């Protein structure tokens, strides 16, 4: 069985760092850099076992095609953007995702990543996420309630089972900027109708009582009676005085599941848009492929 990269399956991490970058020059330098980083990561994982450290190196479409010789990751493509610009694309070449129970350890690993990749990449965005009170989003609503729980269930959803991509996963990242002043102008009832869950108790509002535009309705999708599940590794980010919001991060064995949720949220299926857009907006978006650790080490 191919070994999964260690940042895909962990639950309830308290902190994360996401680094998106473009390749400088030829992609061949990424091969040695990826292996060097994986070796450094293993050292940190052994040194800080209680941190439950994990990390992922993933690649955008053009970069993965160049690294793999065009083999595998058949669903992978550049993030096209959705909703006629409501969900913009900021596709980059490389994603590094680091997560654990300790921000200090994450930061040390991020420094190691910068040493490993060096001049072969140009960092375009670096975001530090944190777990907020009761695993709530900064909106005050619990985030990720329907996230698959347990390693085997999460593996079933997030990891490709067999074939040339066995042990790999598709990744989607999208940074949302919240306008909490706008949110707080709404009554709690109106906020709950936007999300589709009660705010304090985190109870699902019945489908016939919540609007078709509620967030829950837009993303709770089924095909042939089966839910289109994803594994979320999202966290709040930002500063109290400035920009803040949610860094959305999802892993799935099928890019299809992620894309169907996006099409539904941004009105590309039935013209109805997620009511969350009343108080928050996405400002980035990228699709990536995370190969198995075995394949990453053998690039």
UniProtKB/Swiss-Prot annotation:
GO terms for molecular function: heme binding; metal ion binding; peroxidase activity. The active site is at 143 (proton acceptor). Keywords: Cytoplasm, Heme, Iron, Metal-binding, Oxidoreductase, Peroxidase. One of its GO terms (cellular component) is cytoplasm. It holds the Pfam family Dyp_perox_N. It comes from the Bacteria. Its EC number is 1.11.1.-. Heme binds at residue 215. Binds 1 heme b (iron(II)-protoporphyrin IX) group non-covalently. The keyword S-adenosyl-L-methionine does not apply. Its main location: cytoplasm. PROSITE patterns: DYP_PEROXIDASE. It is found in: Cytoplasm. It is an enzyme of class 1 (oxidoreductase). Its cofactor is heme b. Belongs to the DyP-type peroxidase family. Has both general peroxidase activity and dye-decolorizing activity. Can catalyze the oxidation of both protoporphyrinogen IX and coproporphyrinogen III to their corresponding porphyrins. Also efficiently decolorizes the dyes alizarin red and Cibacron blue F3GA. This is Dye-decolorizing peroxidase YfeX. It comes from Escherichia coli (strain K12). The gene is yfeX.
């Amino acid at each position: 069985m191919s070994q999964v990269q260690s940042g895909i399956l962990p639950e309830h991490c308290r902190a994360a760092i996401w680094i998106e970058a473009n390749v400088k020059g030829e992609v061949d330098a990424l091969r040695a850099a990826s292996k060097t980083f994986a070796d450094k990561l293993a050292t940190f994982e052994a040194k800080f076992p209680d941190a439950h450290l994990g990390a992922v190196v993933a690649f955008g479409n053009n970069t993965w095609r160049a690294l793999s010789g065009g083999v595998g990751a058949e669903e992978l493509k550049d993030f096209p953007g959705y909703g006629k610009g409501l969900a913009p694309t900021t596709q980059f070449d490389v994603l590094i995702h680091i997560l654990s129970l300790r921000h200090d350890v994450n930061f040390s690993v991020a420094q190691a990543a910068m040493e490993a990749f060096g001049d072969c990449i140009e960092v375009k965005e670096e975001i530090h996420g944190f777990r907020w009170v009761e695993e709530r989003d900064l909106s005050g609503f619990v985030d990720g309630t329907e996230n698959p729980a347990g390693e085997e269930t999460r593996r079933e959803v997030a990891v490709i089972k067999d074939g040339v991509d066995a042990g790999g996963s598709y990744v989607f990242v999208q940074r949302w900027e919240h306008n909490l002043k706008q949110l707080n102008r709404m009554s709690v009832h109106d906020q709950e109708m936007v999300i589709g869950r009660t705010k304090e108790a985190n109870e699902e509002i019945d489908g016939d009582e919540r609007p078709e535009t509620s967030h829950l309705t837009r993303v709770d999708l089924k095909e042939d009676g089966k839910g289109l599940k994803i594994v979320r590794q999202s966290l709040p980010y930002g500063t109290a005085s400035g920009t803040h919001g949610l860094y959305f991060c999802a892993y799935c064995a099928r890019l299809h599941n992620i894309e169907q949720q996006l099409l539904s949220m941004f009105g590309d299926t039935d013209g109805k848009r997620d009511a969350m857009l009343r108080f928050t907006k996405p400002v980035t978006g990228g699709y990536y492929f995370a190969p198995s650790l075995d394949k990453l080490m053998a690039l």
